[in-house]
UniProtKB/Swiss-Prot annotation:
Residues 997-1006 have a biased composition (Basic residues). Interacts with CETN2 (via C-terminus). Residues 104-123, 468-487, 634-653 are annotated as: Interaction with CETN2. Residues 1049-1063, 1085-1100 have a biased composition (Low complexity). This is Protein SFI1 homolog. The keyword Cell membrane does not apply. It comes from the Eukaryota. Plays a role in the dynamic structure of centrosome-associated contractile fibers via its interaction with CETN2. InterPro entries: CACF_protein. Belongs to the SFI1 family. It is found in: Cytoplasm, Cytoskeleton, Microtubule organizing center, Centrosome, Centriole. GO terms for cellular component: centriole; cytoplasm. HAT repeats lie at residues 131-163, 165-194, 263-295, 327-361, 392-424, 1141-1173.
Length: 1235
């Protein structure tokens, strides 16, 4: 939907611009002269195309030429007609005018006619050029407006998503709070019910104790065990609210205590029994609470100890690793400084040698370039003289120039190949010595590393044994506590996950409903807007067609009259002398044909010989190079295999030993864990059996007690319970019926009703308890005294038990701390020894890595030097080809102009005759007297308009970075006609071009073909034979400049939209894009892995990796980037921590610089866009119209949006300057360190 809407919007704006252009020509009923067929082909509007199709031809000559000039016979026939018409015209002038000199009249008429035609052409050319610029700027502005619109919509969408997420999080938090409140209320009710039940159980036990005094103590113990079992079962529910329960119990206990003290002061005798009963109940609860708190405190202490020990161990390990890394970095920096001092002399020597070679090569190239330039200047001068002397030998001179230029380019290429071969031979002579030195150094380093590694493994085994012992001792104490805590946490998390899943489902359903409703509203509004816009566009098109039809009808009537007068005058001159001119032309054509065929055959034979020699020499050179590369690759592979085999054997032995040690440790750990689990299971079984027995006994006693109590209380309780059950059943039935109908929001009201019911039941229970209180008081008088004594003894025992446990805990903590200190001292000594060994091993390994990296850097610099030479040669070749093509284009333009002048002479013959006749009659009347009235002259035919267009200047303007580069300018039909004539007159050049386009191009490296990623619009390719390549950054810097790429057909760009409604262009001689032939030196591989990389490159241009533009801005070629490391094969010792850190840092710096460059380019493009929009507004305000107000308002809105975007980008650049400065300082520091 979005892509279709954008295409439709672009078409609408383009049609509005075309209406504006057409309204300037048809304003106020004044009809200007229509455009010719060549100018109308450039405008891609449906209205102008319909007008051009309906225009009649001016004369039979134009119609005849338009139908026959596409073939060779048609051109010959046209030439014959021109010659015959010219001869008849001269004879008729002599016969009619007599003593009047026609040369003077013709000279006067030609001057007037040329001045008039030039003024009209200048005016129309200026209008067309100005309107074309406005159209291109409008297209560019509209494209940037669409980009900005899409970005703003995306921004708003992201903000809306963020706001929705915030709302959802708030709703989830609110829902969680509400659920917690409801759960807490239900939990309070549950606690109240539980307390009442416990109170009833205590009363039953007291009654039983009074009846049977011997069983009283046993029953109390059973009840205590039952309470403990129930508390253990409900521990998971009470865990998260323990603190709140503690505070609540303490406050209740304090209030009750104050209340008892007050009652004592008032009535001592009446409150004594009640106070004893209150004390008994609260002391039981308090003792149980103290027991639970003591257990929790012990668990928390154990968990804190375990946490402290684990945190200490983790922080100590982290500190040790950081210290080791710091020591390794210090050693690495010292080694780097030493190696830099050692390699300074080598580097200076290599730089000096490389500089001398470059100077010699540059001097030789400059001399060759000067000689070639002199020869080319002399050749061009001679060619200009020959063109002035005679036009007959023009084609032969062009052929000779092309062949000589081809020979010079071939010699230049083979000279570059020979130089590269000599340089490679010199490098190969020095390679064996370097390889031998590197092998000796690697072997010595490997021996040292192996010795140190053996010592390190022995120490490491001893450390592992000690660590295994310490870990086993540590696990014996902490494993059971950790297991219990993990079990509780797991249960709690399961409940939490279930609640979260329900909440997420509810929020997801609500979100889907809201999004669907919003999307439906937006689609309906979008459809209505599109229908309204289509209706407006159709109405405007109908009005435009009506105006164009009226103007065309008037113009056609006038031209029809002019055509009839011209045909009557030209029919007499055409048919009389046709046979004579044809005979003369046939004799001259036969001689020209014979000369042309001889020249073509000689040129073809010479070119074939040159191609055979060049191909044979190039084949031999490639064969020699391939053999040398294969030998070097075999030697490198053999050396790499030997080194890998040795390293693999050492690594396998080390891994085997490590595996055996780890297996022994794992077996011991598993054995120890099994023993611990078995002991824990045994204890758990014993405890569970004891608890089950106690539960059975308590259940039997409680059952007997209930039977005795229920028999007494059941009569009164049945009536109250039956009434209560009846009310509850009614309320429950009403509640379940309402729950099916109402939503989740009705839960609160239901909860309030349920709370009222619970309050009523609690009030009834309190009434029952008051009735039983009198009976309890009498029972508690005798049991309370005995229970006090027993309670005091229990308190003393508990205090003694606490003191003993505290003393044991202190002794254990002291012993553990002493052992831990001893282990810590031993570990520190072992770590210091390992750090020293690792430091020495890292030092040797870094030396090895530095040597390999240095070799890699040297090889990379050599490759860069070779690529620079190939670039220079390629640039010279491109300049030569551009000069030759420019000359060919100038010659073709000259020939086309001559043909156009001849056509204009034939077409203006009748108008010239009328003018001369008028002058003669006026002169006769003045000399001889007025004999009669002069005949009215026929209307002068409108002169043909010719537009000239220089593609080279357009290409240069496109390369300079104008704002109009984004659109594809169509090629003028005049240029196509000139190129067609050139191809017809030069069959040899046409055959060479077809062979050049059909020939398969050799493989080229990816850095010469891939365009750089940038924010500027890409430049379209220029098609045709006579078009020169764009001069600009692509000639001087082909590595990093933007390569011209053809526009994708299915892309919704303005070029594709503008070419849709207009007529199709006439295809030129070369239909495909013109590929550049690169020299063979640019196809040399960059290293040993070049063939594999070249074969692995994708075939399509979309999947090719693009070179980042930040590489072009790097001032120092000695600083390597991470892409350079990844492009070549990695050595055996490049995987070190220092190099990885350096690569990561350089990648981050590169990303920051790329982001800064992209923002800067976006700011430039927005500024250009704003300037183009301001110019367009100024030009439109100079010539205002009624239809331009809407377009001007839209453009003003777009200009405001672009200015806001410019302000935002400027602020971003201002904020990014400080981090970019830090990145540049870091790069300079790295450069100094590497130097």
């Amino acid at each position: 939907m979005s892509s279709r809407w954008l295409n439709f919007h672009e078409k609408m704006i383009k049609q509005r611009m075309e209406k504006k252009v057409d309204s300037r020509y048809f304003r106020d009923g004044a009809v200007k002269k229509p455009y010719s067929a060549k100018t109308l082909s450039n405008k891609k509007s449906s209205a102008s195309f319909g007008i051009r199709r309906e225009l009649p031809s001016t004369s039979h000559l134009v119609q005849y030429r338009g139908t026959h000039t596409c073939t060779r016979q048609g051109r010959l026939r046209e030439l014959r007609i021109r010659c015959v018409a010219r001869k008849f015209l001269y004879l008729w002038i002599r016969m009619t005018f007599g003593r009047v000199f026609p040369s003077k009249a013709r000279f006067y008429y030609e001057q007037r006619l040329l001045r008039k035609v030039f003024e009209e052409w200048k005016e129309e050319w200026w209008v067309f050029h100005h309107e074309w610029k406005l159209c291109v700027r409008a297209d560019c502005h509209y494209r940037y407006y669409l980009y900005n619109l899409m970005f703003q919509t995306w921004k708003t969408y992201v903000r809306q998503q963020q706001e929705m997420r915030n709302k959802y999080t708030r709703a989830e938090v609110h829902d969680a709070k509400q659920k917690m409140r409801q759960a807490w209320k239900s939990w309070l009710i549950y606690v109240v019910v539980r307390r009442t039940k416990l109170q009833m159980q205590t009363t039953a036990l007291e009654f039983r104790q009074r009846s049977i005094l011997r069983v009283w103590w046993s029953m109390w113990r059973q009840q205590l065990g039952q309470v403990r079992v129930s508390r253990a079962l409900h521990a998971s529910a009470v865990k998260h609210r323990a603190l709140s329960l503690q505070l609540q119990a303490w406050s209740q206990w304090r209030e009750q205590l104050l209340y008892v003290q007050k009652e004592k002061q008032k009535v001592v005798s009446a409150v004594k029994h009640h106070r004893h009963w209150q004390k008994q109940r609260f002391l039981k609860a308090w003792l149980e609470y103290l027991q639970v708190r003591r257990v929790k405190r012990q668990q928390n202490e154990m968990a804190e100890r375990f946490h402290h020990v684990s945190v200490l161990q983790i922080h100590f390990c982290d500190w040790q690793q950081a210290w080791e890394q710091r020591q390794s970095l210090y050693a690495y920096h010292a080694q780097v400084e030493k190696l830099a001092r050692k390699m300074a002399l080598r580097r200076t020597f290599t730089h000096w040698k490389h500089y001398m070679l470059l100077c010699a090569e540059e001097a030789a190239q400059c001399e060759m370039a000067e000689e070639h330039h002199r020869h080319s200047q002399l050749y061009f001068c001679f060619r200009a003289l020959k063109d002035n002397v005679t036009h007959a030998h023009l084609q032969q001179i062009r052929r000779n120039l092309a062949h000589r230029q081809h020979g010079v380019t071939l010699l230049h290429r083979f000279w570059n190949l020979w130089q590269s071969q000599i340089e490679e031979k010199k490098e190969r002579e020095q390679l064996p010595l370097l390889h031998a030195a590197w092998d000796h150094y690697r072997i010595a380093l490997l021996c040292k590393c192996i010795k140190l590694w053996l010592q390190y493994t022995q120490k490491r085994r001893y450390k592992q044994r000690l660590q295994a012992r310490a870990d086993g001792h540590f696990q014996q104490r902490t494993l059971p506590a950790a297991f219990h805590t993990w079990k509780r946490l797991w249960r709690w998390r399961q409940q939490d996950n279930v609640l979260n899943a329900r909440a997420t489902r509810f929020h997801r359903e609500t979100l889907e409903k809201q999004v669907f409703s919003i999307w439906r509203q937006k689609t309906f509004q979008h459809q209505e807007n599109r229908l309204a816009e289509r209706m407006a566009i159709l109405h405007a098109e109908r009005q435009l067609l009506h105006r164009s039809w009226f103007t065309w009808h008037q113009q056609a009537a006038a031209r029809h009259q002019e055509q009839e007068w011209q045909t009557a005058a030209c029919a007499h001159h055409r048919h009389g002398r046709l046979k004579k001119a044809f005979c003369l032309w046939r004799e001259s054509a036969q001689g020209l044909r014979a000369e042309r065929t001889g020249r073509v055959r000689a040129a073809e034979f010479h070119v074939a010989q040159l191609l055979r020699r060049a191909w044979s020499q190039w084949r031999e050179c490639l064969a020699v190079r391939g053999a040398e590369r294969r030998k070097l690759m075999r030697a490198d592979r053999h050396h790499q295999q030997r080194v890998r085999h040795r390293a693999l054997q050492a690594w396998v032995t080390y891994q085997g030993r490590v595996r055996s040690i780890l297996q022994e440790v794992a077996a011991r750990e598993s054995q120890h864990n099994r023993q611990l689990l078995r002991g824990a299971l045994r204890r758990w079984k014993e405890n569970t059996m004891a608890r089950v027995d106690e539960a059975k006994k308590t259940f039997q006693a409680s059952a007997h007690y209930r039977r005795t109590i229920c028999s007494k209380v059941l009569v009164q309780w049945r009536e109250a319970v039956s009434v209560q059950i009846y009310y509850r059943q009614q309320e429950d039935s009403a509640f379940w019926e309402a729950r099916k109908v109402l939503d989740r929001g009705c839960l609160r009201t239901w909860f309030q009703r349920w709370r009222d019911c619970s309050r009523r039941s609690a009030q009834q229970r309190l009434q029952l308890e008051r009735a039983v209180q009198h009976h309890r008081r009498q029972l508690l008088l005798e049991g309370l005294a005995r229970w006090k004594m027993h309670h005091l003894e229990c308190v003393r025992k508990r205090l003694l038990h606490r003191q003993s446990t505290q003393l044991l805990a202190q002794r254990l903590s002291r012993t553990c701390f002493r052992q831990w200190r001893q282990q810590l001292a031993a570990r520190r000594q072992e770590q210091q020894a390992t750090v020293r060994a690792l430091w020495f091993w890292a030092f040797s390994l870094q030396a090895k890595v530095w040597a390999t990296w240095l070799a890699f850097v040297l090889e990379r610099r050599r490759k860069k030097a070779r690529l620079q030479r190939a670039l220079q040669a390629y640039q010279g070749q491109l300049l030569q080809e551009g000069a030759t093509r420019l000359l060919r284009f100038a010659a073709s333009m000259k020939a086309s102009r001559q043909q156009l002048q001849a056509q204009q002479q034939v077409q203006a013959a009748h108008s010239l005759h009328r003018a001369v006749h008028r002058c003669a009659t006026l002169w006769k009347q003045k000399v001889l007297g007025r004999g009669g009235k002069p005949q009215p002259l026929a209307a002068v035919a409108p002169s043909r308009k010719v537009t000239f267009e220089d593609p080279l200047l357009n290409c240069i303007a496109a390369g300079a970075g104008d704002a109009t580069v984004g659109t594809k300018r169509p090629q003028a039909p005049l240029l196509q006609g000139a190129l067609g004539c050139l191809a017809a007159e030069e069959p040899h050049a046409r055959e060479l071009n077809t062979a050049h386009s059909a020939r398969k191009q050799p493989r080229r490296p990816h850095f010469l073909l891939e365009p750089a990623r940038s924010q500027r619009p890409q430049k379209p390719k220029e098609h045709g034979l006579g078009m020169a390549q764009p001069a600009g950054p692509s000639l001087t810097r082909p590595f990093l400049a933007e390569a011209p790429t053809a526009q994708v057909p299915h892309s919704p760009g303005p070029g594709a939209l503008s070419s849709a409604p207009g007529p199709k262009q006439i295809p030129t001689a070369s239909t495909g894009p013109e590929l550049l032939l690169l020299p063979p030196s640019s196809f040399m591989p960059c290293g040993a892995a070049a063939p594999a990389r070249a074969s692995a490159q994708p075939a399509t241009p979309r999947d090719k990796p693009q070179v980042p533009p930040s590489l072009a801005s790097v001032p120092d070629p000695h600083l390597l980037l991470p892409g350079d490391f990844s492009a070549t094969r990695a050595g055996p010792g490049l995987s070190t921590t220092g190099s990885l850190d350096l690569e990561a840092e350089l990648e981050g710096i590169q990303q920051q610089l790329l982001h800064y460059q992209t923002t800067k380019q976006n700011l430039w493009s927005c500024q250009r866009q704003a300037s183009s929009l301001r110019r367009w507004l100024e030009l439109s305000r100079e010539e205002p119209g009624p239809e331009d107000q809407e377009v001007e308002q839209q453009v003003q809105k777009e200009l405001q949006e672009v200015e806001l975007q410019i302000q935002q980008l400027a602020e971003e650049l201002q904020a990014q300057r400080q981090p970019i400065g830090t990145c540049i300082a870091r790069i300079q520091a790295l450069r100094q360190a590497l130097r």
